[in-house]
Each structure stands twice: as C-alpha cells, then as structure tokens.
Amino acid sequence: MTTATFPVDLASYKTIALDPSVPTLTDEQRDALAHNLQLCRDAIVFFTAYAGARGLSGHSGGPYDTVPELVILRGFFEHSKQGGATKVMPIVWDEAGHRVATQYLLAALEGELPIEKLFHYREYNEHLPGHPERGYTPGVKFSSGRLGHMWPYINGVAMAHPDHVLFMLGSDGSQQEGTDAEAARLAVAHKLNVKLLIDDNNVTIAGHPDDYMPGYSVAKTLEGHGLDVSVGNGEDLDALYTRMCAAITSDGPVALVNKRLMAPGMPEIEGSTHGHDVFKASAAIKYFEQRGNQQAIDLINNAPKVDSRPQYPGSSDETDANRSLFGKVMVEILQEMEPEERERTVRVFDCDLEGSTGIKAIHEAFPEIFVAGGIMERGNYSAAAGFGFDEDKQGVFATFSAFLEMCISEITMARFNRSNVLAHFSHAGVDDMADNTCHFGINNLFADGGVAGHDGSPDNTRVYFPGDPAQFRACVKRVFTDKGQRFVFSNRSKIPYLLKEDGSRFYSDDHRFEPGKDDLIRDAGPSGGYVVSYGATLYRALGAVESLRKNGVDVGLVNKATLNVEDDAMMQKLAAAPFVLVAEEFNIKTGLGARFGSQLLKRGFTGRYNHLGVHKEGCGGLWRQMGFQGLDPEGIEKSVRELIG
C-alpha cells in the first residue's frame, strides 16, 4: 500500500447547489464549476496515467471528457438534496463502463472511498476494477461495461421512480449499439424522464466515426426516434449549463449531444483515438508541467511496476500473443489468393477492436476486403454470415469473447442458413483481464448450440482454443477453408510455447493441426491419471503436472484444442484412467468440464472426476486473475492431490 499523498487536493472541491429553474450561472457559480472541472480533470489524468505507468493500462479520455457534465450534475444533486422542487436521482449513470474513473472519483469525493485508494486503480484485489461493479467497490452504485446495455436498463429504473429525473452519460460509440435504438423508442413511447448527456467526440477505439461510418449522426438518429435533441459545445460551461437546465425542467426523454474533441487540451492526445485508452506517461507529464504539479510528475515517473507473470515448468521463456497472430496468419493465407478471388470470396468485419483482435493487419494489407463495422456486434456478425451465404464465400468476424453472448441468436440463424463464418473471439477467459468481470469471456461454448439437420447431417460448428502459439498458427491455417461456423478463441495475455520433456518445442513451426484430435502433452504410466486443459490454462496445468511428477505423482496432460468434438481414441485412454481433472478458464457451469464427465461415463469411466473453471467474479489485476480462480499451477496441483486422496 502506497504511503504517498494524492497529488490533487480533492478536499478543495466546492460543493454548490444549482437550481435548474434558474438557467443562468452567477459569477460565483461559474468560478466554482471551473475550479471543480479543473480539479476533477487533474485527478483523472493523474490516477489513470499512474496506473498506466505501472503497466495496468486503463481508460483516461472518456472520463476526462465528461467532467463538465459531471460537475454540473453534482450541483443539481445538491439542490435536490436540499429540498429543490425537481427530484434528481443522485446517480451518474454511465453507459460507457470503461469511464469508470468517473465513478471512483465520485466515490472519493463523496467520502465512500479513501482518496489514496485511487493509487490502486485496476490493481489486483484492490476493488477498483476496469469497469464499475455494484457491491464490489465502496461508493459505486451500479454495474456497467458492455456498451449499449445501460440505457435500456435505466428505462426500467425510471419507470420504478416516476417522480425522479435520471441522467445518463452517453457516448457516440455506445450509441451505435442496436439496443440503444430500442431504448430510445421505449423512452419516447412512455415519456420517461431520462436525460442523456452524450459525449460526441468523434472518436472510438479504432478510428473516427465520421470517417468509417459516413452518414451516421447521433443527433439525427435520436431525433428520428422522437427524442428532443439539443446539440452544443460540451466545453462551454455557460451554454452547457443552460441546456442541461432546459433538459431537466422538460418532461420526457431529452438528449444533449455535446460536441468536443477527444481529451480537449491534453498534450499529445487531443482529438486522437489514443485518448480512448490510458493517457501515456509522457502526455500526463506534459499536462502536469503546464499545471505546475511537480508532485504528480514525480509520482508518475517513479510509479512501481506491477510484477510480471512467473515462468512455469514445461513452457518457454518466449511468449506470443495469439490474438495478434490471428491477423498475421490471415494475411499470410490471403496473400496466397489471387486478388480478384480474394475480393470476391472474403470479407472481414471489425467491431471497432481491430488492434486488439489482430485484424488490423488485414486492414492494412487488404483494405478492399475490410469492413470497419463500428460498435455493432450483432449486425456485423449477421453481415459476415450473410456474406458467407454462398458456398464459395466466407465472412471473417472478430471481437472480444465477452461479446459472444450478445451474438447467440445471430449465430443460430447463421447456422440455419448454412453460412460460412470464421469468427475470432479474443480476450477469452480471465487471464490478464483488469477490465474484470463484465469483460470475462467465459461462456464461449454458448456458440456450440447446433443440432443435426433435417437430413440427419451433423452440425459442423467447430470451436477451437489452442494453448500454444505454434498450434494456434497451425489451427487458423488449417480451418480457414472449412465450411460452416468456426470459432477460434485467444487470450488477452501473451502465452508461452509448450516444451517437450527434452526442452524442445512440442509444436514445431511446420506442425499440422488436425481438427478434433487431442494431443498428449505428457503421458502417464499405466496407473496414472490425467489433467485435460486448453488455452492459457494449459501451460499452467503443465506446470502443475511437472511439479506433481517431480514429487512422485503419476499424472499426464492432454491438450484439448477442439472443444466440441470428442477424440474417441483419447477418450478411451482417459476412460481407463483412475482420475481425470479438467482445468479451464471458462465458466464452471457452461464450460467443457460440465459435459466432459458425461462423455467419459459413456465410455465406461469408473475413476474419480472433477473440473476447475471460473466460479466467481473477478478480482482485478492481470495474471493473478487465474490464481484467484484456482487456475494457477498451485491451484491445479492442489486439486489433483485432493482428487487422488
């Protein structure tokens, strides 16, 4: 726990009451708001950049942007608290959960969270995860994090509290989600007192909406749904206050579309897509040089790095990011095609995450087949499936694994239409996921919901989660030309290469992947049992197996990279073993282990069985998320010992 003093004097925040029936600020009110605005932006720049300097990443620009709205809202809350005529629910709802720095700042200002706690933003087990989680962080009043989910939710809150006005911070990115369109229609139809404060900064992760989605306008879209819409400069305090007063004193839903550059006034960042992520230390230092805050500069320069993941027995020092490899391997495949054939038969759909899912490499190499689809996962998946409607064509789709849950119905309809889709869902599991629970990709096997067709043909959906970079490369190359829907999962974290017992790589550079075949990473003796694993859990399981074998326990390890097909030969081998433990980073209720035991029983298994998986909400931080779930080598070894008695 740091003993440093927080370098921004949050105690100097000036609490004022703002009466929305008086739409003009006094000089005193304006000065107080300007002071509070600068104070809050200073705080957000510091503790987010400090976390970034420590290696915890995060998001700075969104919470930085919406501070003018925030300080005015707190004035409305204070007036309502003092008995003002207009009841305002004192919650700053936010549909962009990555702007969680706003909620932590509020918790500190309201005395729910010690100010020094902000030094530990996104750190392991410090209760300040990368998205707000109700009941986990003191002072945080709601959970948010998946775009497009909050407005529909607070429509219901508004119905439950018809005597209150609700305010929600929105964004031009989140408003691209289809559920916001549904929420708009419901709010208008029922005249709900929901007021939207939309940060329209023309920036999302992968680009500028004006460039990649010409014709899209937040204001015109909301007007089309029937909302009253006010467009203005979000950095003009007086005008913003007047517009917010008009919104709060009118009946029914209102949207204030507040135009501004991303991160206005922020060195190196203003107006750029880099503002979505954590502010770089260099930018924050320049900012505090302008502010004359040497203490903040010194703290950022000397921020202690979080400790890195240990190396485990049986795996290499060298690591690679499979999520990035996906795009690189796809470029290699596409380069071998004739240009006309490539453009005619392949289309790649991005959901504003091209840099994170690896497909930016495809965008750069073959822009003619790349679709910058914005933040519209459901529609983009269906478009990819529609492109793959013809037998000789296929759509390629990529987003985070957490958002697979949003696409289940589209996946089902694609299956009914016999579509060809190669879907890469990165950030699977929980490893390195400081963004925490709402971004966990743990229900990925929901994708495997097909049944036999009318003609008796088996469902050809395939689900792959290779646990080694060389195997991942071979998998993508092998399954590219297969028919049907193929789901390839990767982790956020970099993972090492698996090693043979002699120290050489288990999978060579020319390895040929065979769908449905399990690999025996370590064989057990005639009386030995097995651990079955995949993904980023696999090399941790290997570490556990190596430790157990060193201490006289006869145990082997199986890599099950194809998750929804049984390898009969391997299953017979496992069915004859005295014990089997499945260790995985998917949901313990919906993952491989929940069904694997039944398949063993069908083959005559009489041994002991157990499975490990994600069984509780996250703890923040990076690689320690796995140990928190009992999925590090120590946890897996302990479970093996408990299983054998």
Question: Can you say where each PLM-predicted feature lies in the sequence?
Answer:
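Thiamine diphosphate
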Residues: 123-290, 354-445, 567-568, ...
